[in-house]
Amino acid sequence: MKRSYNKIAFNLLVGCLMAAALTACGTKKAALNTQHPTPNTQPSTPNTQQTTANSQFVKKVHDNAVYAKNITAKIDFSIMRGDKEISVGGKLMMRRDEVIRIQLNVPLIGMEAGRLEFTKDYVLIVDRIHSEYVKGDYNQVDFLKNNGLNFYALQALFWNQLFVPGQTKVTDAMLKLFTAEILNTQQPTPITLEKDNMKYTWLANSQSGLIQRVDVDYNSKSSGSTHVSCEYADFKAMGVKSFPNSITLNMQTTAQLPAGTKKMPKNMKLGIRMKSVDNDSKWDAFTTVSKKYKQVSVDDVLKKIMSM
């Protein structure tokens, strides 16, 4: 009975991870612009001191980025997909500009069940229960490629930072691409960036400049809409900076999937609660998959996910 429960739980968990990691895959066949659009760079009309204050605030938010090269932590990982919910333990291991890895344990037992690994060049998902793995290129997903969404955008979400789609980092010169509007020092200040069908909104504490939430909105007449929000809480000191020890990802979508595929749940929620956060550097950045493991396609995995 316990073994059956663990298998079901793990299947659900891997399925939700894949759906979260490949949210856009359901729309990858949609007719999107094949050219790489550039961010909206038209500056707003200057308004003297207010414009200067807004620009200074964007710079303050940008400067809040932590200096650490490595961030590691034990985590409590929870996910709700449709009416199904599960919580497990695991590890989060991140090395700046190299990798983001989430390792998850089998419920009740504690052994590693699988891992989700993002690098600059690929996404790797290892299923240790069934000795299978998926390895995909970001360029294989048209939605991600056409909208400049890559490893560095995902890294910025996990590291609580601003990002510019299609860029590897945000330079001081790029800060003019962001639009901030300080409305009330007692309320979070929105910082926005628009790119084709995408709109990004960072909500930052008007006094500290710490990013409390990110909203990503995608709207397309041909393939539906998707809203993703990432909320940050429990900020704790990391050197001279602060880093959120709690990350909650929410997704709502009306994305159209390939014919014959079950509809994607309209709502999905993923939570990562960090414990024992450290800057340990003594670990290998990249996973080597055993030759005994079978490589399966993204399409095969998506079919399994949507059939749950």
Language-model features, listed with the residues they occupy:
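C-terminal motif of bacterial Sec signal peptides marking the signal peptidase cleavage site
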Residues: 20-24
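N-terminal leader/targeting segments and the immediate start of mature chains
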Residues: 25-86, 298-308
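Flexible, processing/modification-adjacent segments and terminal tails
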Residues: 57, 129-200
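Solvent-exposed loop/turn segments connecting transmembrane beta-strands
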Residues: 81-85, 106-113, 196-198, 222-224
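Gly/Pro-enriched, hydrophobic low-complexity segments
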Residues: 170-294
